[in-house]
């Protein structure tokens, strides 16, 4: 099966439809997305390779997915730590933080010190809707993820990448190439620039909605929330 990519406009419209005619709440979608990310991390980095996972969390929904993933990783036996410098005030994110705090998952202020003592990084800073300039404190964080030898898993899009054009031509993120990408719902056009292990996650789309947005839902096996795909399985 050749999986079609979703543009930023189509992906945003799909999210709105899932929360209207699809009858999902944003909490449900974030929970299922974060669960997918946690399964991908467990697949590529089993605990025997190191339990410490640093989750870099941004201020939007991508960051929410990261908080959910951190919680699930804790329950799998990992030792997550969360870097969350820009916290929204709304109730959804505050509840996600509380859930992690109740598990005594540490929130760290110094990303760079935490990076020196972790086994894996989850990049949940910016997602498919990112555009414009990377603002503080994230430029140095993205550059550090680009330079580290620690494996990095990005959520839906490598942070700073344009959804269509991939990595910036220069500046922040121009040399950021994570090891793993988890595309949520469907791949985005930027995957043509990505060379690592690629998963699709988000096992919640009804066939009628997939047909309307002209993309294929991959075949998930058993109880898996992710499917690993190869370059020749994506239609740009």
Swiss-Prot record:
An MF annotation (GO) of this entry: nucleotide binding
Cofactor-binding details, from the entry: Binds 1 potassium ion per subunit.
Recorded GO CC terms: mitochondrion
Cellular localization per UniProt: Cytoplasm; Mitochondrion
Cofactor: K(+)
Pfam family, one: YjeF_N
EC numbers: 5.1.99.6
InterPro entries noted in UniProt: YjeF_N_dom, YjeF_N_dom_sf, YJEFN_prot_NAXE-like
Binding site for (6S)-NADPHX: 61-65, 127-133, 156
Entry annotated with the keyword Transcription: no
UniProt xrefs under Gene3D superfamilies: YjeF N-terminal domain (3.40.50.10260)
Binding site for K(+): 62, 123, 159
Coiled-coil segments: none
Keyword NADP attached: yes
Superkingdom classification of source: Eukaryota
YjeF N-terminal domain ranges (all copies): 11-217
Similarity comment: Belongs to the NnrE/AIBP family.
NCBIfam families reported in the protein's UniProt record: yjeF_nterm
UniProt protein name: NAD(P)H-hydrate epimerase
Organism (species): Neurospora crassa (strain ATCC 24698 / 74-OR23-1A / CBS 708.71 / DSM 1257 / FGSC 987)
